[in-house]
């Protein structure tokens, strides 16, 4: 049973790093009521900026896969395994969506994805070893910071890039739900030093992934 689960998670990890992700939900599309700018072709500079932002988002989803896989393997609680598994499935949707958008923008994922994945896996295992409530608190804080990060991307994306905006908006909704679920399952509020360290690591990752 454990071996089967380990093989399944290994397969998911390979797909995360290689960009071969499965969607359980269709790609979000712009809603007419939210489109405030006419459909126009993005300039080369706008496409490059949008691609950089979506590459950062894609890296975030690679890390999310690793984190939740590790936390799922670390807990002995069936109910918490279900929480992490559901989040991982929805994060895999995000992974596939951002990958598709990068292709449409004639761009590529980060070349450092194996590094990001490995680092996040180690962090997830460390969080899991601190106990279920700390692990859930880590999940909630991760999602809270990702939500703020997505808000900033909605401010930065070109106004005419409706496709990227639709993806980011749905991702934001999902991340908020994941964070709420983690706290409702018993997550502990992390101390300020831990939250500050997470923000610092996130800044390094986002600044690097935008370009590489």
UniProtKB/Swiss-Prot annotation:
Cofactor note: Binds 2 iron ions per subunit.
Reported function: Catalyzes the hydroxylation of 2-nonaprenyl-3-methyl-6-methoxy-1,4-benzoquinol during ubiquinone biosynthesis.
Annotated CDD domains: DMQH
Membrane-topology descriptor: Peripheral membrane protein
SUPFAM superfamilies in the cross-refs: Ferritin-like
Gene: coq7
EC number(s) per entry: 1.14.99.60
Name of the protein: 3-demethoxyubiquinol 3-hydroxylase
Residues noted as binding Fe cation 1 in the record, renumbered to the chain: 61, 91, 94, 175
Subcellular location, record wording: Cell membrane
Residues that coordinate or bind Fe cation 2: 91, 143, 175, 178
Keywords in alphabetical order: Cell membrane, Iron, Membrane, Metal-binding, Monooxygenase, Oxidoreductase, Ubiquinone biosynthesis
Main localization category: membrane
Keyword Transcription regulation belongs to the record: no
GO molecular function: 3-demethoxyubiquinol 3-hydroxylase activity; metal ion binding
Family stated for the protein in its record: Belongs to the COQ7 family.
Reaction(s) catalysed (UniProt annotation): a 5-methoxy-2-methyl-3-(all-trans-polyprenyl)benzene-1,4-diol + AH2 + O2 = a 3-demethylubiquinol + A + H2O
Pathway: Cofactor biosynthesis; ubiquinone biosynthesis
Keyword Metal-binding on entry: yes
GO biological process assignments: ubiquinone biosynthetic process
Xref: Pfam families: COQ7
Cofactor requirement: Fe cation
Cellular compartments per GO CC: plasma membrane
Protein species of origin: Paraburkholderia phytofirmans (strain DSM 17436 / LMG 22146 / PsJN)
Matching Gene3D superfamilies: 1.20.1260.10
């Amino acid at each position: 049973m454990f071996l089967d689960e380990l093989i399944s998670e290994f397969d998911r990890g390979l797909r995360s790093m290689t960009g071969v992700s499965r969607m359980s939900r269709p790609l979000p599309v712009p809603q007419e009521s939210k489109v405030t700018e006419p459909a126009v072709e993005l300039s080369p500079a706008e496409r490059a900026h949008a691609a950089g932002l979506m590459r950062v988002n894609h890296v975030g989803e690679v890390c999310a896969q690793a984190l939740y896989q590790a936390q799922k393997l670390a807990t002995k609680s069936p109910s918490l395994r279900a929480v992490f598994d559901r989040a991982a499935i929805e994060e895999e949707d995000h992974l596939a969506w951002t990958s598709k958008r990068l292709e449409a923008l004639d761009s590529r994922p980060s070349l450092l994805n194996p590094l990001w994945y490995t680092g996040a896996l180690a962090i997830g295992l460390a969080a899991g070893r601190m106990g279920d409530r700390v692990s859930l608190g880590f999940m909630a804080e991760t999602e809270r910071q990702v939500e703020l990060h997505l808000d900033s991307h909605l401010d930065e994306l070109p106004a005419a890039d409706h496709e990227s905006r639709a993806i980011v908006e749905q991702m934001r909704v999902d991340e908020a739900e994941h964070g709420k679920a983690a706290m409702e399952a018993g997550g502990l509020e992390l101390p300020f030093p831990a939250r500050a360290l997470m923000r610092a690591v996130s800044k390094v990752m986002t600044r690097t992934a935008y370009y590489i």
